[in-house]
């Protein structure tokens, strides 16, 4: 039985749990951790995890694979806190949208014996939280994988197979290439969307302008 740990039980972490449990329920045991106890409780109730761990050390105890599904800013603290509690053969991966900095943190904080594979599923919603998590979120999407130094073929194959079980298509990239490509197709559109809405909302005529906004404006500013 594969033992999976999911740290962070929002949209992405919850959807990973739901997708894996749906695809491999009989051969998988999922432990989850969320700083918000209500999110952890709902993840259990929704079937995204089998058990909610009370803390980070408990979350990774005995894990074969640990997914870190938090904002990048939270990762240094998480990596420091789990480093001494990881099983020797545990593979650690993440879901952050940038990889160069994350790979640097992993090398800095994780034991040399730990295999870290950067991950980034190209999927999401404009809403967040465990309540909007869904098993089909990753179906048909590209799942970027960035092997770390010394990543074994077996570890990369394990994470690739889990991504495929979620319905995604694994794509192996180098960290720098990932960040440059994603900046153009994900980060830039988000920036443009935010800038457009902020500019329009700041106009004195926004109350009237908003009544004229139709599907085109909604589509562009959805992000």
Feature locations, PLM:
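Phosphate-coordination loops involved in phosphoryl transfer and adenosine-cofactor binding
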Residues: 1-3, 89, 140
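NAD(P)+-binding Rossmann beta1-loop-alpha1 motif at the extreme N-terminus of oxidoreductases
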Residues: 1-65
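Residues at the starts of beta-strands that form the adenosine-phosphate
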Residues: 3, 27-29, 115, 142, ...
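Short beta->alpha hinge that forms the Motif I/post-I loop of the SAM-binding pocket
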Residues: 35, 70, 95
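Rossmann-like NAD(P)-binding element
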Residues: 56-91
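Rossmann-like NAD(P)(H) cofactor-binding subdomain of soluble oxidoreductases
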Residues: 78-131
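Internal alpha-helical scaffold of NAD(P)-dependent oxidoreductase catalytic cores
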Residues: 137-222
């Amino acid at each position: 039985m594969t033992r999976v740990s999911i740290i962070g039980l929002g949209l992405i972490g919850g959807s990973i749990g739901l997708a894996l449990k749906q695809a491999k329920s009989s051969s998988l045991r999922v432990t989850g951790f969320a700083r918000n106890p209500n999110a952890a409780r709902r993840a259990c109730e929704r079937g995204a995890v089998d058990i909610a761990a009370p803390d980070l050390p408990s979350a990774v105890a005995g894990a074969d694979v640990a997914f870190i599904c938090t904002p990048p800013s939270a990762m240094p603290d998480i990596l420091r806190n789990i480093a001494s509690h990881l099983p020797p053969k545990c593979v650690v991966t993440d879901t952050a949208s940038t990889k160069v900095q994350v790979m640097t943190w992993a090398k800095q904080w994780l034991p040399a014996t730990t295999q870290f594979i950067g991950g980034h599923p190209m999927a999401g919603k404009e809403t967040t939280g465990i309540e909007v998590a869904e098993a089909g979120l990753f179906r048909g999407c590209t799942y970027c994988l960035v092997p770390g130094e010394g990543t074994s073929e077996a570890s990369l194959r394990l994470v690739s197979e889990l991504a495929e079980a979620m319905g995604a298509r694994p794509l192996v990239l180098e960290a720098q290439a990932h960040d440059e490509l994603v900046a153009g197709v994900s980060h830039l559109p988000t920036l443009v969307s935010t800038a457009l809405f902020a500019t329009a909302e700041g106009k004195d005529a926004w109350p009237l302008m908003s009544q004229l906004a139709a599907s085109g404006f909604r589509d562009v500013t959805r992000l």
